[in-house]
Structure formats: C-alpha cells, structure tokens
Amino acid sequence: MLQLQPSAVATTIQQGGVIAYPTEAVFGLGCDPDNDSAIEKLLVVKQRPWQKGLILVASSFEQLLPYLDITQLTEQQLQFAQSKWPGPFTFVMPIQSHVSKLLCGEFDSIAVRVSAHPVVRELCDTLNKPLVSTSANLAGEQPVVDAQHIITDFSDKIDALILGKLGEQRQPSTIIDARSGQILRNGS
C-alpha cells in the first residue's frame, strides 16, 4: 500500500484503485464513481451491501451535476444546499437515470457533499470529478480516526493511503433530504 500525497493518488484512482484519505471527521475510503469495478472493490473492502448506496464528495457543486437530476429540485432547495457548502452537510438528491446502482443502491437518489477538507478538495480538483466516499471501517464498526489503524486494518485491501490531518469535526456530517428538507441524521 502506497502512502502518497493527494495529487499522486489521481492515477491510482483513475486505474480503478481504492484509497483511504482524511476527511472532516474520520478517514474515508474512496474510488472513481464512474468505475463499477472500483466501486465493487470498495464495497468488498468495507463489507457493505450495495443496496445501501454510497456518498459522493466533491470540491464544487458543478462536479456533482453529471450525477444529479436537479430538474426534480426547486431553486430554493438548490440554494439551501449550496448555502451549506462547502461544509459538513450531506444532501440526498435525485439521480440521473444513468447513475450506477452500485452508487445509489436501491434508491432514486444519492447522498452528496461539497467538502471543505483540503485533501478531499485537492483530490477532486485533480480528478476533475467527485469521489465515492464512505467511512473507513468495516460495516457496523466504528469509523477509523487514526492512519495507523488504516495501515493495520486495510493495508492489504486498498491501493493507497493519503496521510494528512482530519478536520475539526468530531461527528459525521448532517444528512438532509433535499426534496423534503427532513434531517435524516444529525451530525456536526
């Protein structure tokens, strides 16, 4: 497992690799959202059922647009989401019909966040697209907040680890349904 800087990991991601990287609150596992093989590998590493869906993180709302059907959202709903970004708010938004079921699971929507974390932003800027994101832990276990645990638990399962500091958040992001405004999970 390579330990690299964000810009050096872009090739690993583009080649279908799964990486671990710091986020606002915990270490995340990520891959290319347009590569079903990479998503399948990530789901196996995490031992997460595909039906649950995943999150996309981005450095800008524009990076998320190819995946979202914003025609199902009002201008006010879009403005509300954008007023919370970048930051620790994840919004569940309707997807375009071409989006892989591996990303959205059994849903007609996907969770998306525009991150304020510098590593996530640099990764997404380098890739010029969002990144699949899920907490670095096995399904049902506590998320990892220490790079050493990534090395211990995932070194033979992932392709790269980006070393870096976690953000200041101690709780996962708040999740809001963009259509209804309902808070699905209280977080930071």
From Swiss-Prot:
SUPFAM superfamilies, alphabetically? YrdC/RibB
Every YrdC-like domain range: 3-188
User: What biological process terms from GO does the record include?
Assistant: regulation of translational fidelity; tRNA threonylcarbamoyladenosine modification
Name of the top EC class for this enzyme? transferase
Looking up InterPro entries in the UniProt record yields: DHBP_synth_RibB-like_a/b_dom, Sua5-like_dom, TC-AMP_synthase, TC-AMP_synthase_SUA5
Q: Which reaction does it catalyse?
A: L-threonine + hydrogencarbonate + ATP = L-threonylcarbamoyladenylate + diphosphate + H2O
Major localization listed first in the record, in broad terms: cytoplasm
Task: Please give the start and end residues of each transmembrane region.
Answer: none
- Compartments, as annotated in UniProt: Cytoplasm
Any one GO cellular component localisation term in the record: cytoplasm
Record's keyword annotation contains Iron = no
The domain of life is Bacteria
**PROSITE patterns (alphabetical):** YRDC (PS51163)
In the UniProt record, does the keyword Zinc occur?
no
One GO MF term on file is: L-threonylcarbamoyladenylate synthase
Keywords, alphabetical: ATP-binding, Cytoplasm, Nucleotide-binding, Nucleotidyltransferase, Transferase, tRNA processing
Query: EC number(s) per UniProt?
Result: 2.7.7.87
Q: Which NCBIfam families match?
A: L-threonylcarbamoyladenylate synthase
UniProt lists the family membership as follows:
Belongs to the SUA5 family. TsaC subfamily.
Role, per record:
Required for the formation of a threonylcarbamoyl group on adenosine at position 37 (t(6)A37) in tRNAs that read codons beginning with adenine. Catalyzes the conversion of L-threonine, HCO(3)(-)/CO(2) and ATP to give threonylcarbamoyl-AMP (TC-AMP) as the acyladenylate intermediate, with the release of diphosphate.
Q: What is this protein called?
A: Threonylcarbamoyl-AMP synthase
What organism does the record attribute this protein to?
A: Shewanella frigidimarina (strain NCIMB 400)
